[in-house]
Amino acid sequence: RLVGSEMCIRDRRTDMLKYLAKRIGRSILTLFIIVTLVFCLLRLMPVEGYFANYEKMTEAQIQAGLQSMGLLDPLPVQIGRFWVNMLHGDLGVSHIYKVNASVTGILAKKLPISIQMGVYAMLLSLVIGIPMGLFMGRFKSRWPDKIGTAIIVLIQAVPAAVYYLYIQMYGTTALNVGLLFDASNWKYWVLPVCSMSLGNVAFYAMWLRRYMVDESNKDYVRLARAKGVSENNIALRHIFRNAMVPLVQYIPSAFLNTVVGSIYIESLYSIPGMGGLLVTCVQRHDNTMVQGIVLLYACVGIIGLILGDLLMVLIDPRISFGKKEGGR
């Protein structure tokens, strides 16, 4: 038995490594296509996106500047040079946002605050959304389910920008905080974190409730009831645990989407994170910064998808990597 168990573990590890190799290979190809496409599209933008004082420059100065940056070279040469530099950690320099500042350095300063806010928002959404979905699934068609459904419908029916503005309008007065974000004061984190977590609260509650309802109709639940197991034990020890398996798959990607999708909230609260940086760079036509941000966001999204698949398979041993791969 021990030998058989060791062989199963070894086979599972081999399947996992094969699966990871395939997913990473596909992810690299996807990343290459996305970033290269954005790179080409940005080359169609006006050239003022590469100069801070474009309006004061002569045509000769503009052409000399473009030549020094290699923007007059054939497009395949530019793409090849970009990827070679990127592999060495060089994403170029910003010409508008901060003149001659390293794109990599700017991203390294802006990303931590967005990740920190995303972590807080994700934890809050899990703390609220999971118990909410649990009660809705446990008391299906009763008052906890009806109240939870009404809350979910309200969150999903109202445009996000509307309740963002209401949270800011009434929250700043209630907490006595200004509109300029202060990372050293916990009160300034409350409103943006609550705003970012609302959508995920509805998502987790709705899907956990659905998965629990599906699980409650399966044979193992009927068997547990026939053995006299209490409804609370069935709900917590059996239905809830199995219902969480498919939901866990979405947690990494939901977290990373929260970080990436915080553009409006960071701009609304003047948070010096990635969202505000992207808006500013797009408005100022800082093409070098924009392509660096797109590269980072693409990497973040791909990592989230891979982590979600791995979590789902690792948590539930019944799911094999071969089946997971075949299902795609």
Where are these regions (language model features)?
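Alpha-helical transmembrane segments of integral membrane proteins
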Residues: 17, 107, 111-144, 160, ...
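Membrane-water interface segments at the C-terminal ends of transmembrane alpha-helices
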Residues: 38-45, 82-84, 150-180, 197-199
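Hydrophobic membrane-targeting alpha-helices
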Residues: 36, 40, 44, 135, ...
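Hydrophobic alpha-helical transmembrane segments of membrane transport/permease proteins
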Residues: 31-81, 171, 175-188
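Cytoplasmic-entry segments and transmembrane alpha-helices of multi-pass inner-membrane transporters
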Residues: 17-26, 132-168
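Short, small-residue-biased leader/transition segments that mark boundaries at the very start
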Residues: 2-9
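Charged, compositionally biased N-terminal leader segments and the immediate start
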Residues: 15-41
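An internal, D/E-rich "acidic patch" concept
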Residues: 71-128
